[in-house]
């Protein structure tokens, strides 16, 4: 049996991040944690590109444009959707998540989805560190995995 071990070496990887500015204080803190973790994993600061959008519904279109540029090994979506008193929470959460997944599959690029969906600000604040750090690790690990699988695929074709 062949097993591919997880690889968290971010050296030489190019990572794109899209951050929703709605609930910006939480999102901005998530961005800081995510970038710090990427750097700890070896991703060079000049290899991290950050784009911001108004809200979670706009994240997929920005991700799609970053993915179509073919300049990135992985992408990260950062945002916060907090339940209100209307159905809008479900709509935004579901549509944003579906859009992120569609971009990943359509463009064959790993996307770490760090869009928090919580009942209140306190829950979101409690999850900043873990969710943002995990997103960085997921992006690096999955970028390395996809790159390795693509290399093996092309080697098999030769």
UniProtKB/Swiss-Prot annotation:
Pathway: Cofactor biosynthesis; riboflavin biosynthesis; riboflavin from 2-hydroxy-3-oxobutyl phosphate and 5-amino-6-(D-ribitylamino)uracil: step 1/2. It is an enzyme of class 2 (transferase). It holds the Pfam family DMRL_synthase. Keywords: Riboflavin biosynthesis, Transferase. The active site is at 88 (proton donor). 5-amino-6-(D-ribitylamino)uracil binds at residues 22, 56-58, 80-82, 113. Its EC number is 2.5.1.78. (2S)-2-hydroxy-3-oxobutyl phosphate binds at residues 85-86, 127. Gene3D superfamilies: Lumazine/riboflavin synthase. One of its GO terms (molecular function) is 6,7-dimethyl-8-ribityllumazine synthase activity. Belongs to the DMRL synthase family. Catalyzes the formation of 6,7-dimethyl-8-ribityllumazine by condensation of 5-amino-6-(D-ribitylamino)uracil with 3,4-dihydroxy-2-butanone 4-phosphate. This is the penultimate step in the biosynthesis of riboflavin. PANTHER family: 6,7-DIMETHYL-8-RIBITYLLUMAZINE SYNTHASE, 6,7-DIMETHYL-8-RIBITYLLUMAZINE SYNTHASE DMRL SYNTHASE LUMAZINE SYNTHASE. This is 6,7-dimethyl-8-ribityllumazine synthase.
């Amino acid at each position: 049996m062949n097993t591919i071990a997880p690889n968290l070496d971010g050296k030489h990887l190019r990572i794109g991040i899209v951050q929703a500015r709605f609930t910006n204080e939480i999102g901005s803190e998530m961005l800081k944690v995510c970038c710090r973790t990427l750097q700890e994993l070896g991703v060079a600061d000049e290899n991290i590109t950050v784009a911001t959008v108004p809200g979670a519904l706009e994240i997929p279109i920005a991700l799609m444009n970053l993915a179509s540029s073919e300049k990135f090994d992985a992408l990260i979506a950062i945002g916060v959707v907090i339940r209100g008193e209307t159905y809008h929470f479900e709509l935004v959460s579901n549509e944003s998540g579906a859009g992120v997944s569609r971009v990943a599959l359509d463009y064959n690029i790993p996307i770490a989805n760090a869009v928090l969906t919580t009942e209140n600000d306190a829950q979101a604040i409690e999850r900043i560190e873990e969710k943002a750090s995990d997103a960085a690790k997921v992006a690096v690990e999955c970028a390395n995995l996809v790159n390795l699988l693509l290399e093996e695929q092309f080697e098999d074709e030769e």
